Amino acid sequence: MYNRVEAPILFTVLHNMKYGLCCISLNLQDGDNPAKFQTMTYKRFSGLPRSEALSILGDRILNNMVVTDQIIQYCADNNMVYRISSDLFPLITYDEANIELEDLPNYDDIQDSFDTLAQTIATNDVRISCHPSEFNVLASLNTKAVDKTITELNFYSSFMDRIGCPANYESPMNIHIHNKHGSNKEIVQRFINNFNRLDCNCQSRLVIENDDKLNCWSVRQLLTDFYPATKIPLTFDYLHHACHPDGMTEQTALEECYMTWGNYKPLFHYSESRPGNNPRAHADYANNTFNTYGLDFDLDFELKMKDKAILNFSQQEFAHAR
C-alpha cells in the first residue's frame, strides 16, 4: 500500500487516506532535545507570587506552542493529519486561577507563536483537529459543568481560528455525549440547548463520537435519536463500536457515520484492545488491519505508542502489499 522511503519515518500513502497523530510525537521526544509539552498545576501556581507564577506559566505555554509547531511540521513531512493536544494552555480556562492569555508577561511572544503555527499549517496544508477531554459534557444536568464545557470548547475553537483552521468539519472538534440521565430525547434536547450557547465557529466544527460503554451512546443510538435532531456529523470509532456494537455490523455503522459528513472528508478513529480484562483499554501497537469498505476518510490512530505505532503499521502494510 505504501512506497518505501529511505528515511526513518517517512512514507507515501498510495490512496487518499491520511493517518492521524494524536497530540504527542514519541519520535520527537527521542534525542538530546526532546519536544515535550509542559503543564502547571493550580497548587503550584497558587503557591507562588502571582507575577512569578504568570511568568512560569507563560514560558510553559510558549514551549507548548513551539512543540506543537514542531509536531505539525513533522506531520507534514510524514503525510499525517494532526490532533492538537487539549493540554496546551494549562489553567487558562480554570475558573479559580482567573487567568487570561493577556495577563502573561510573554503574551506578545505567544501571539507570534500563533502566527508561526498558522504559517506552518497553511504552507504544508496539514489537517488539524481537536478532541477536548471527556469532562466536556454539553448534555450534563450540572450547570457548572456545562458552563465549564462551553468555556473550554469556545476557547479551543478560538485557538483554531487564530491559527488559521477553517471553521467547518475540515477541522473538527470531537466530543462525546457522555450522558444517560433521562430519556434519549431529553438528553438530546439538553445537548441542543447548550450547543446553541457555543460560538458560531465552535458549532461549525463540533462532531460527536460513538461511545464504548454499553450504557452510553452507540452508533445505532446516535443515528436514531441524535443525528436526526442535530445534523451534527458522527465520528466512527472502530474500537468503541467493537465494544458496543448494539446490533450493527461494523460496515453498516461505518457507512452510516460516513454519510453524516456530507461533502466533508470524515475523520474517524482507530485503535485495538490491549490484551487483558478490559477490552476498552487501548493497545500499544496495531496487530490487525482495518476495513474502509471502499470509503475515503482520514483516520486518527489512538494507539499508545503514537507515531511509532503509525510507522509500525505502515511498514507492516507495505510488507504485506509487496
What is each PLM-predicted segment?
Residues 89-91, 134-137, 179-181, 241:
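A short, flexible beta-alpha/helix-coil linker loop
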Residues 1-16:
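N-terminal amphipathic/basic-hydrophobic helices that include classical n-h-c signal peptides
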